[in-house]
């Protein structure tokens, strides 16, 4: 069936000026034509979706999410991750639908505990049982025994354990491997994290990183690393990690390594701030009156 989608304007995300009065022609699951309304004839009996004064654009890609987290909830991030897997799966289904309704059509889930909740939700979306964006998932994030985020990942110390952990994550359904490669923890609370964690100390040796990448690449899977800064930035890029998550404390002399080895930075915390009691928080987004924002 052919569907015609009309709107006030279209942003094609190429840098071009918005197209006014666009019409998108969809045949089945594929967009076959985009044109302005004056240059296209819509059959009288056609299936038309008229978006009025709204703006159309390509789907957004969120490169770093945790399906068990929801900034609108009163619990801290850590408390949410410690909830039973069943509850986190239900909540995740709700937030993923909200993500899609906000325009996120693809997302990368980088660690949701040891129960593979992200795998379950990805597969349910793919089967059409729940509504949400297409997901790439890490299944089980990997961290050292003295690393950060104990509620998110499984422990692997040394080259042999690293290799086994990567294999296990792939067996459990991982599309991407997530490593916590910086932050050596000095405590269990967010206050410890804020005041005591060694954010620029490598959590793994360079050889451990190389082993993880070797094992992942054998299966055609890329590796992402939670990395704040320090020597591990260069180690990770040399080892072949595809992305560094956060990278808040990188230095100027790290930049050539990104250019040479082709890695990129994915920073999901652009709207987060850190509270010494509750941990990571978002601004009071619940107070925004989204329905009163002007069309753009």
Residue ranges and their predicted role:
Residues 186-296:
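Active-site core of metal-dependent hydrolases
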Residues 7, 54, 64-66, 226, ...:
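Histidine-centered divalent metal-coordination motifs
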Residues 146-210:
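Active-site gating/metal-coordination segments in enzymes
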Residues 2-3, 10-57, 78-79:
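Histidine-rich, glycine-flanked metal-binding segment
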Residues 68-71, 102, 109, 113-117, ...:
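Active-site environment of divalent metal-dependent phosphoester hydrolases
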Residues 91-117, 131-143, 174-188, 222, ...:
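Divalent metal-dependent hydrolysis catalytic cores, especially in the metallo-beta-lactamase
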Residues 54-129, 207, 239:
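Metal-associated gating/positioning segment near the N- to mid-region
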Residues 77-90, 147-164, 222-224:
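Active-site mouth loops of central-metabolism enzymes
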């Amino acid at each position: 069936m052919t569907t015609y989608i009309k709107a006030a304007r279209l942003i094609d995300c190429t840098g071009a000026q918005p197209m006014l009065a666009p019409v998108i022609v969809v045949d089945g699951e594929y967009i076959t034509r985009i044109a302005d309304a004056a240059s296209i004839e819509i059959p009288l009996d056609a299936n038309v979706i008229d978006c009025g004064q709204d703006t159309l654009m390509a789907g957004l890609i969120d490169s770093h999410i945790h399906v068990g987290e929801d900034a609108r909830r009163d619990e801290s991030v850590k408390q949410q991750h410690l909830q039973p897997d069943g509850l986190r799966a239900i909540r995740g289904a709700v937030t993923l639908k909200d993500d899609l309704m906000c325009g996120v059509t693809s997302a990368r889930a980088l660690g949701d505990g040891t129960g593979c909740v992200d795998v379950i939700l990805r597969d349910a979306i793919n089967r059409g049982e729940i509504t949400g964006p297409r997901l790439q998932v890490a299944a089980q994030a990997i961290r050292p025994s003295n690393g950060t985020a104990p509620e998110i990942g499984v422990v692997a110390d040394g080259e042999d354990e690293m290799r086994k952990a990567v294999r296990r994550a792939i067996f459990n359904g991982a599309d991407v491997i997530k490593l916590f490669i910086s932050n050596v923890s000095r405590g269990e609370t967010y206050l410890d994290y804020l005041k005591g964690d060694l954010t620029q100390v490598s959590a793994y040796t360079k050889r451990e990183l190389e082993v993880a990448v070797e094992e992942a690449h054998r299966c055609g899977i890329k590796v992402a690393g939670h990395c704040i800064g320090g020597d591990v930035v260069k180690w990770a890029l040399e080892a072949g990690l595809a992305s560094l998550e956060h990278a808040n404390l990188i230095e100027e002399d790290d930049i050539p390594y990104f250019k040479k080895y082709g890695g990129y930075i994915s920073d999901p915390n652009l709207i987060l701030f850190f509270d010494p009691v509750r941990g990571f928080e978002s601004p009071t987004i619940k107070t925004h009156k989204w329905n009163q924002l002007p069309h753009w």
